[in-house]
Amino acid sequence: MERIICPSLMCANYDSLKDEIMKLDSAGIDIFHIDIMDGTFVPNFGMGIQDVQAIRRNTNKMVDSHLMISNPGEYVDLFADLGVDLIYIHPETDMHPVRTLGKIKARNILSGIAINPGTSIESIIELLPIVDYVMVMTVNPGFAGQKYLNFVNDKIERLVKLKLEYKFKIMVDGAISEEKINKLSDLGVDGFILGTSALFGKEEEYKDIVKRLKTIKEEAN
């Protein structure tokens, strides 16, 4: 099964964002990942509405929005109108996550939940039947360049067992290196949000990196 490769555009070169999008698109990435932050749920600010518009305008690939914001349900229609294909919410930021996920589905958009390192599986298990994607944060959300939190692997292993019943895809986000991609693929992870650890700021061209990341497991075996 081919891995889902998702560049985190927060790590891209903003001086030439359009060129970055076009190169990543032609390199064969699967989903463009956009981090939206409000400075409240996480102590940082991410990409804005104009960034989402520019990305959507320059690619036909899937685009997701990771809403690291308070009350995400209030913004579902806004991001749906911008043309995103997948919306992730953090359930702990929403008084009514079931309603918000239903609102996402009603707009014919894929629904996802993002799980912080400190969020328990028990607290989100009732949402699993109604989501398409579960994104596990392997760092604390809000900043690039953090170290991978190994204790999260236990949570990933539990989700791999649960997805056999509920049929969602498992994504991981945070300090994802090539080595981690190989190991996490073996655990049963479907896709990877990639930043500076594996994709951006390298001397290689994106097309060469993406090709290798999609095939690294087969080469290792």
Please identify what each model-predicted range represents:
Residues I89-M95, M135-G145, L187-I209:
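Glycine-rich phosphate-binding active-site loops on the catalytic face of alpha/beta enzymes
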Residues S8-C11, G46, S65-P72, T93, ...:
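Glycine-rich beta-to-alpha transition loops that act as phosphate-gripper elements at the mouths
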Residues G73-D81, T119-P129, I176-F192:
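Catalytic cores of alpha/beta
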Residues S16, E74-Y75, D85-K169:
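Conserved anion-binding
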Residues L17, L24, D35, F79, ...:
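Conserved, mostly hydrophobic/aromatic
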Residues I36-K103:
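N-terminal active-site wall of soluble small-molecule enzyme domains
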Residues I4-S8, F32-I34, V63-L67, I87-I89, ...:
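Hydrophobic faces of well-ordered beta-strands that scaffold small-molecule active sites
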Residues F45-S65, K103-G112, V152-I170, R212-N221:
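Alpha-helix-loop-beta-strand connector modules within alpha/beta enzyme cores
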